[in-house]
Amino acid sequence: MAMKKLLIASLLFGSATVYGADGFVVKDIHFEGLQRVAVGAALLNMPVRVGDTVTDDDISNTIRALFATGNFEDVRVLRDGNTLIVQVKERPTIASITFSGNKSVKDDMLKQNLEASGVRVGEALDRTTISSIEKGLEDFYYSVGKYSASVKAVVTPLPRNRVDLKLVFTEGVSAKIQQINIVGNHAFTNDELISRFQLRDEVPWWNVVGDRKYQKQKLAGDLETLRSFYLDRGYARFNIDSTQVSLTPDKKGIYITINITEGEQYKLTDVVVNGNLAGHSAEVAQLTKIEPGELYNGSKVTKMEDNIKTMLGRYGYAYPRVSTQPEINDADKTVKLHVNIDAGNRFYVRRIKFEGNDTSKDSVLRREMRQMEGAWLGNAQVEQGKERLNRLGYFETVDVETQRVPGTADQVDVTYKVKERNTGTFNFGVGYGTESGVSFQAGVQQDNWLGTGYSVGISGTKNDYQTYTELSVTNPYFTVDGVSLGGRIFYNDFKADDADLSDYTNKSYGIDGTLGFPINENNSLRTGLGYVHNGLSNMQPQIAMWRYLDSMGLNPNTTDRASYSADDFTLNLGWTYNNLDRGYFPTSGNRTTLNGKVTIPGSDNEYYKLTLDSVQYVPINDDRTWVLLGRGRLGYADGLGGKEMPFYENFYAGGSSTVRGFGSNTIGPKAAYYNSNSYGCSNGTPICNSDDAVGGNAMAVASMELITPTPFISEKYANSVRTSLFMDAGTVWDTNWQNTAQTSMYDIPDYSKASNIRVSAGIALQWMSPLGPLVFSYANPIKKYEGDKSEQFQFNIGKTW
């Protein structure tokens, strides 16, 4: 439209000035119709100045130049003697931009696209651009299957040549796939092929991936899936001949027809390697080895190319070119592969840089690097550095880029870009519980103290049954070789009776230190010494507790309370294997920890204690939003030298860190008291059972969890929130328990059985909040026993095992 007016104006001017074809000298330029655009700005855009000799061509160029500014809807140039009169009609200015009816596309995204096209408040309205935007948005809706969608721009005039721009959306409904037909398939049925598609004409209730809503991008992906399916099974001549997508008259249904030619299956006969192998021909030969009579497989060919690139990358050849051309023999249905390799230059690392570590010091990140500056570039070492940074748990994301150094042929810089997360946990709370009464809790845990990598924690708890304080410090790099040093001091005043456990009070304090030794990238060992003083009092006569006191030579009366104190020195040992992909919210890998401690000479007690914890993450889909999580914990402890393990070292289960849905520490053996009349048992029985948990010297806990995408959470917070469905199982038992005629007479259960397994199932939500990790769970016990306590909703601050 604008060009049409330009042409008309030029013709009119030309016809009006035939007599002046030789030109004339401009003595003045006068504008008519300017409102928003200043005269000076308009003059700057004109190729004609006062004093110039102007021809018809100059006038035409002037009109084009003014139209090109985008400020005018119409431009006319007239002559009055030696004065140029420029008549313009300005485009209206956009006063506001609003949207209506858009549900699939957010306002912010629309504004970004409009601004990218030059449509923003304060700018001139270009109707041609608006029409293009309308069409582009409608094309977007068509691509996601909404064929009845429409987008209309409503322009409302305002005073002073301004307008309101409103985009009105009518999105309609997504067209659903009525039928998918594949024509030309003989070796495989339609159901076999379509079952691998994302788009489906039928979606079972359990299929969370399949979708009947048509999307152009998904169809393209499904066609590629179909192609790969055949190529991976030897059909080297497979071809998708055509694809038809038909729309029903009401635009609500889609019929898809895919015409294919399967061809025959082809076998591999040979692999021929050509090019610059950089002296690694033996390794290339190993990577390109094929089995006699093996079917052609497109995915294996791609994997072979990737393996060759990875191998060359280990030796510094960062940008190798590897391509494979299949030589197909239709006569005998065979394929010969020609692999062309160009290793290129060997690259060396000039610098390793870090970005985004505003808190963490460079040295904390640099010590995790396995790629060295000045050495040749090793892709495996660069990736190891990324994995180790992720495993620290200091960062939400870690990305790595390798950039060539300008002006050099063989140097690169490696840049690690991190996004730091809050590595500190601060909590302070006041609460009230039926067991704990008024409760105060405060704590600070910082896993990256002042950016040094030190882990420092101080915590305290005060309620009706416990007063606890602890200070801990760990230096993960006590030596440059990665030997860690950690220490802890604590004080605990614990009244077990008020915590609904077996009746006793224990005032304990202690100190321990630990050295950690890295063995390799994934394995480490720990050793340390510890001291603890346990001051036991108010011990009520209970079978398992008295059994321990008897083994210590105290032989207390079964009708009296008892007191005892013990000082123990322990040798602590541990081993950890860890190849998790990151320190928090992992998606793949395993972490297994074995810990043990044993008392050493000078201790009052003689016992050992072992625990094994293992966690395994298995991603289900490529983007790792669906992950299977398996967890297990085993524990066993026993006395030495004829003594029993102290009962206060027993294992417990139940609660948010073991078997969810059960009360904390309530699973397993219960206290059986002597002299029952004194402790509320009926009928004057000398022994009776209670609901007080006493724990046991053996424990087994397992969990299976399905981690799913969190609904209703934006992508911005996806890395901070995790949702899962779980099933937990666990048991605690006492291998030293012996049922006697007396315990059987009074119906005391056999607590030596490991088969009394509790089971629960539920849903959990974890949130890496600014205050630290928060864990919410709701679980329902499926299998429980007498004396167990249910606790369906549970909340926890801090990491769980």
From Swiss-Prot:
Transmembrane segments: none annotated. GO terms for biological process: Gram-negative-bacterium-type cell outer membrane assembly; protein insertion into membrane. It is found in: Cell outer membrane. HAMAP family: OM_assembly_BamA (MF_01430). GO terms for cellular component: Bam protein complex. The lineage of its organism: Bacteria, Pseudomonadati, Pseudomonadota, Gammaproteobacteria, Enterobacterales. Residues 1-20 form the signal peptide. Part of the outer membrane protein assembly complex, which is involved in assembly and insertion of beta-barrel proteins into the outer membrane. Constitutes, with BamD, the core component of the assembly machinery. Residues 24-91, 92-172, 175-263, 266-344, 347-421 form the POTRA domain. This is Outer membrane protein assembly factor BamA. Its main location: membrane. PANTHER family: OUTER MEMBRANE PROTEIN ASSEMBLY FACTOR BAMA, SORTING AND ASSEMBLY MACHINERY SAMM50 PROTEIN FAMILY MEMBER. Keywords: Cell outer membrane, Membrane, Repeat, Signal, Transmembrane, Transmembrane beta strand. Part of the Bam complex, which is composed of the outer membrane protein BamA, and four lipoproteins BamB, BamC, BamD and BamE. It comes from Serratia proteamaculans (strain 568). Pfam families: Omp85, POTRA. Belongs to the BamA family.
